[in-house]
Swiss-Prot record:
Chain coiled-coil ranges: none
Gene responsible for this protein: WNT3B
GO MF, one annotated term: frizzled binding
InterPro entries: Wnt (IPR005817), Wnt_C (IPR043158)
Keywords: Developmental protein, Disulfide bond, Extracellular matrix, Glycoprotein, Lipoprotein, Secreted, Wnt signaling pathway
Name of this protein: Protein Wnt-3b
Annotated source species: Meleagris gallopavo
């Protein structure tokens, strides 16, 4: 009689939170670039260079950008952004629905509401 051994290997997807954290770190440390046009024998060529020479140049694995993101705090009819003014925010949240982030440093008004509703309770 003989013995049989089976090994199975596969790649597992990392935890979704870990992926999000990784991408957020990349976003927070992204390098701003400048598009430069110069003439070569084959015509005009565009290249990217770091906007600030004081910082080390980005690697192939770094995130880079050459246009700033729109200001999501203020309305912009051209891009269809409504801004965040008069949005409801969560005072106790540190997430994207929190007042600190959603109100863009403008401050917020707190409103307390009392409502009377029929609850259709049966005792």
């Amino acid at each position: 009689s003989g013995s049989c051994e089976v090994k199975t290997c596969w790649w597992a997807q990392p935890d979704f939170r870990a992926i999000g954290d990784y991408l957020k770190d990349k976003y927070d440390s992204a390098s701003e670039m400048v598009v430069e046009k110069h003439r070569e024998s084959r015509g005009w060529v565009e290249t990217l260079r770091a906007k600030y020479a004081l910082f080390k140049p980005p690697t192939e694995r770094d995130l880079v950008y050459y246009e700033n993101s729109p200001n999501f705090c203020e309305p912009n009819p051209e891009t269809g952004l409504f801004g965040t003014r008069d949005r409801t925010c969560n005072v106790t949240s540190h997430g994207i629905d929190g007042c600190d982030l959603l109100c863009c440093g403008r401050g917020h008004n707190t409103r307390t509401e009392k409502r009377k509703e029929k609850c259709h309770c049966i005792f």
